[in-house]
């Protein structure tokens, strides 16, 4: 499945996703890991914040894939409620991924920065955020 695919329904032993797989072979008898997002930051109520930059360090001995997403709280949980700002970025063991300060991301009241990783507890995040913007 491509990045951003979500489980739409679980019916007994069958799992349905919100889009088709790019894999043409059968997926029976395979192990599936359900790793959800970690909300790294939520913009405070009645104000805006600006994501200036961030460093996401791999603290494991294996390469991991990282996805960063902005959840727009004004839209809610829909297919348009989240926008990936980095999708399936490979982060080698002992390395990091950096969001540079060349582009800023405005977070409105209640918006969230979410981090997805394909391994549990594999990423340490350090964020630079300007808060209290009106």
Please report, for each region that a protein language model flagged, where it lies by residue.
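C-terminal interaction-tip segments
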Residues: 35-59, 67-68, 74, 109-110, ...
């Amino acid at each position: 499945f491509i990045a951003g695919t979500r489980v739409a329904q679980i019916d007994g032993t069958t799992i349905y996703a919100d889009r088709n797989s790019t894999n043409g072979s059968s997926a029976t008898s395979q192990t599936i890991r359900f790793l959800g997002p970690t909300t790294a930051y939520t913009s405070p109520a009645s104000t805006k914040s600006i994501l200036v930059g961030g460093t996401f360090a791999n603290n494991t001995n294996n390469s991991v894939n990282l996805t960063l997403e902005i959840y727009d709280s004004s839209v809610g949980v829909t297919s348009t409620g989240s926008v990936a700002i980095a999708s399936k970025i490979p982060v080698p063991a002992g390395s990091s991924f950096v969001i540079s300060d060349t582009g800023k991301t405005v977070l409105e009241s209640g918006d969230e920065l979410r981090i997805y990783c394909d391994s549990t507890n594999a990423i340490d995040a350090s964020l630079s955020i300007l808060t209290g913007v009106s």
